[in-house]
UniProtKB/Swiss-Prot annotation:
Classification via SMART domains: S_TKc
Recorded GO MF terms: ATP binding; protein serine kinase activity; protein serine/threonine kinase activity
Domain of life of the organism encoding this protein: Eukaryota
EC numbers for this chain: 2.7.11.1
UniProt similarity note: Belongs to the protein kinase superfamily. NEK Ser/Thr protein kinase family. NIMA subfamily.
Name this polypeptide is given: Serine/threonine-protein kinase Nek2
Chain positions recorded as ATP binding sites: I10, G11, K12, G13, A14, F15, G16, S17, A18, K33
Role summary: May be involved in plant development processes.
Length: 591
């Protein structure tokens, strides 16, 4: 604190204050955010420290600049961030006094905000409080996204469930107690752009119930006709009720309406700054220049590298397809990730899922038989190498977390047919104990304005939002499942949990729970999910594994047998659950 001179207080909230300070040596102005720890709950104090750690790791030209942070006398968490002379967007809307912003300026601002969100989402970070008062304007009229007090880090396919944020910017799925993902930030950004365009809030009511009704029905007034139809349609697409129908940040950056402004932002940004990739349709000549020339035979090299290195993840680039045109930055190859369009599968599309999962299980079994000595290395692979990529948005360049996707389409071996599957696959082998390492901690930072964690009943829904990573409660025989998840997952997970906790007596109750859950689906969807031929293939794969184990036992090759059966021990949850599920599926088919 001795390095800074306090100039004035520029803001005050429920948990602290914001001070305008000047660095004594640099003579540059910054904002000092002081979060009070005294007389606060343990969660508030923990969240303040988590916010300090999170904002220190974020680096993007369109996110507020991080300068320094410390804990002052155990009473305050102090965070020093860049100062934006233009104030926040809420103040700018008031200063406009009814004068509309130009469409060009709004498009530039939207592109910058989308790049900031795309960077966060690519690093599995939900902002959860995108609103006009958290959007700041720099001296050069560029945008900075700030205030990570409610941000949350997601692990793998995990979803958030805490009802936090500002009510008028909350998405319908959040208000409906449905777990939400990155599309919730897209909704909030849509509300902001609507407010910046119409100079009035997208959703406004006299009481909370009326506000919730408007949001859940997505009732908004028409935008001013001053703006083009394409721009107005772009804003409306961000405010679609179903999160599956909402575009991701990466998809919005590809919108023809934003392409000219995306290129402008790319050219103005310094090449050394960590910005996101710009999706731009260019000539084949330019596209060839942006990729290494030594990757002509990239597919063959990937296969050789995968067989030789096991679980080590290496990103290799190939020439982009027409639907994945992009301009890459000049960073090192290790920081690259592949930008690709992902088509989500609905819950009922289980035929493709059955086929892909069957091939995955067979491939996994055969790889174990070929290279049993590589199993211990897989078991102790680092966590950051095991996180499967999200399928709700296109991959983007990022520096904080390594990428795990390539354009090739190969089956993901750790997925079951009942889970929503992506239309691509990763070229690396996954650890057998992946489910154990993907528990997502509650990293919600700062005490929320509205905070309650709901338990979600089993119910049917039209569309899935994201692939779900379910957590099992160690003390209960049934699990809480989002309404739109495939019910075959619920049946499987609950049965496994009861076998662990209650032994034989729990199998009856789990069967009843599974029957109740599965009976809610239609007969057609049930027949489609439980495909007889698919379960037969899984059973044959398991039978082949058992036969090979018996052969090793007869030949007294105990060391290799131990390596082969090690993943199925009591400490290895994922393969054990898989084996139980396969056996149960085969018994149901036979009966």
């Amino acid at each position: 604190m001795d390095q800074y001179e306090v100039l004035e207080q520029i803001g005050k909230g429920a948990f602290g204050s914001a001070l305008l300070v000047r660095h004594k040596l640099e003579k540059k102005k910054y904002v000092l955010k002081k979060i009070r720890l005294a007389r606060q709950t343990d969660r508030t104090r923990r969240s303040a420290h988590q916010e300090m750690q999170l904002i220190a790791t974020v680096r993007n030209p369109f996110i507020v600049e991080y300068k320094d942070s410390w804990v002052e006398k155990g009473c305050y968490v102090c965070i020093v961030i860049g100062y934006c002379e233009g104030g926040d967007m809420a103040e700018a809307i008031k200063r406009a006094n009814g004068t509309y912003f130009s469409e060009e300026k709004l498009c530039k601002w939207l592109v910058q905000l989308l790049m900031a969100l795309d960077y966060l989402h690519a690093n599995h970070i939900l902002h959860r409080d995108v609103k006009c008062s958290n959007i700041f304007i720099a001296r050069d009229q560029s945008i900075r996204l700030g205030d990570f007090g409610l941000a949350k880090i997601l692990t793998s396919d995990d979803l958030a469930s805490s009802v936090v944020g500002t009510p008028s910017y909350m998405c319908p799925e959040l208000l409906a107690d449905i777990p939400y993902g990155t599309k919730s930030d897209i909704w909030s950004l849509g509300c902001c752009i609507y407010e910046m365009t119409a100079l009035r809030p997208a959703f406004k009511a006299f009481d909370m119930q009326a506000l919730i009704n408007k949001i859940t029905k997505s009732i908004v007034s028409p935008l001013p006709t001053k703006y083009s139809g394409a721009f107005r349609g772009l804003i409306k697409s961000m405010l679609r009720k179903s999160p599956e129908h909402r575009p991701s940040a990466a998809q919005l950056l590809k919108h023809p309406q934003l392409q000219p402004y995306v290129l402008q932002v790319q050219l103005k940004s310094s090449p050394t700054r960590n910005i996101l990739p710009i999706h731009q349709s260019l000539t084949d000549k330019v596209k060839k220049m942006t990729f290494p020339s030594d990757v002509v035979d990239s597919a063959r090299r990937r296969m050789a590298r995968r067989n030789s290195l096991g679980n080590e993840r290496t990103v290799t680039f190939s020439k982009p397809s027409p639907e994945r045109n992009s301009v890459s930055s000049t960073r090192s190859i290790k920081e690259y990730t592949t930008t690709q369009s992902v088509k989500g599968l609905s819950v009922d599309s289980s035929e493709a899922g059955d086929e892909v999962t069957s091939k995955a299980i067979i491939t996994k079994t055969s790889s174990i038989l070929r290279t049993p000595k590589s199993l211990p290395a897989k078991t102790y692979t680092a966590r950051n190498q095991l996180e499967p990529p999200k399928t709700s948005y296109n991959r983007t360049y990022r520096s904080e977390l390594p990428s795990k996707t390539t354009p090739n389409k190969i089956a993901r071996p750790a997925r079951r047919a009942s889970l929503p599957l992506s239309t691509y696959e990763t070229p690396t082998k996954r650890s057998i104990s992946i489910l154990e390492q993907l528990d997502s901690p509650d990293v919600s930072v700062n005490a929320p304005r509205i905070d309650r964690i709901a338990e979600f009943p089993l119910a049917s829904s039209e569309d899935p939002l994201l692939p779900i990573h379910n957590k099992l409660s160690p003390g209960h025989g049934s699990c809480s499942t989002p309404p739109f998840i495939n019910r075959s997952i619920t049946k499987d997970k609950c049965t496994i949990q009861v076998l662990r906790t209650d032994g034989d007596n729990g199998s009856d109750s789990s069967g009843r729970n599974a029957t109740a859950a599965s009976s809610r689906g239609s007969n057609d969807s049930r027949q489609q999910r439980f495909d007889t031929s698919s379960f037969q293939q899984r059973a044959e794969a398991l039978e082949g594994l058992l036969e090979f184990s018996a052969q090793l036992l007869q030949q007294e090759r105990y060391e290799e047998l131990g390596i082969l059966l090690k993943p199925f021990g009591p400490e290895k949850a994922s393969p054990r659950e898989t084996a139980i599920w396969l056996t149960k599926s085969f018994k149901e088919t036979a009966s």
